[in-house]
C-alpha cells in the first residue's frame, strides 16, 4: 500500500472509533492542541486494533524482523508493542518514564535480550518521550535505529530522533489523517 492508502485506512478506523477529537487538549509534550488522537479507543474493538496492527507491520515490518525485541514507550506504546511482539514471536520490553523506587529499581522492564530493538509508541508529537526511552535503552546496552508510531503529529519528533540517529517511521501524519477526514489542517 502507498503512504496515502495507509493513511486512508487508518483515518477510517480512527473515525469509526471516535478517536479523533476536537477541543482544547494538553498533550504529553505540554503543548496545547485543538485536535487529540486517542489511540486507546482502538483497543476496545478487536477489528480496529487488528487493522492498526497490520498497518504498523506494513510500515515497520522490515525493521521489526531485524530486531531482537520490541520495546514499548509507557504507556501509549505498550499495547501496540505487545501486540507486535506477540504477532512476530519477538521478546517484549518497555521503558518506564522514571526509575521505580522499589523492587529491582529497573527502568527497562521485561529483560529483553540486548541488541537492535524497535521502539514503539502510539503518537509522536515533539518526540521527547520516545527520545528519553531511547536514551534509557542505550544506557542499558541496547541499539535503537527505528521508532515506530501510528501517527506523527509533525511537531518535531522526526527531527529530534534524526539528530539521535533514529529514524521515525509512521503509518500517517496528523495532517494527512485530518485531510482524509475532510477536516483540513489543525
Curated annotation (Swiss-Prot):
Keyword annotations: Glycosyltransferase, Magnesium, Pyrimidine biosynthesis, Transferase
Residue positions binding orotate: 125, 153
Enzyme class: transferase
GO MF terms, alphabetically ordered: magnesium ion binding; orotate phosphoribosyltransferase activity
Origin superkingdom: Archaea
EC number of this enzyme: 2.4.2.10
Pathway connected to this protein: Pyrimidine metabolism; UMP biosynthesis via de novo pathway; UMP from orotate: step 1/2
Binding site residues for 5-phospho-alpha-D-ribose 1-diphosphate: 96, 100, 102, 121-129
Family matches, as SUPFAM superfamilies: PRTase-like
Reaction catalysed by this enzyme: orotidine 5'-phosphate + diphosphate = orotate + 5-phospho-alpha-D-ribose 1-diphosphate
UniProt KW Glycosyltransferase keyword: yes
Family annotation (CDD domains): PRTases_typeI (cd06223)
One GO-annotated biological process of the protein: 'de novo' UMP biosynthetic process
InterPro entries in the record: OPRT (IPR023031), Or_phspho_trans_dom (IPR004467), PRibTrfase_dom (IPR000836), PRTase-like (IPR029057)
Cofactors demanded by this protein: Mg(2+)
Pfam families documented for this protein: Pribosyltran
Complex formation: Homodimer.
Role, per record: Catalyzes the transfer of a ribosyl phosphate group from 5-phosphoribose 1-diphosphate to orotate, leading to the formation of orotidine monophosphate (OMP).
Stated family: Belongs to the purine/pyrimidine phosphoribosyltransferase family. PyrE subfamily.
UniProt name for this protein: Orotate phosphoribosyltransferase
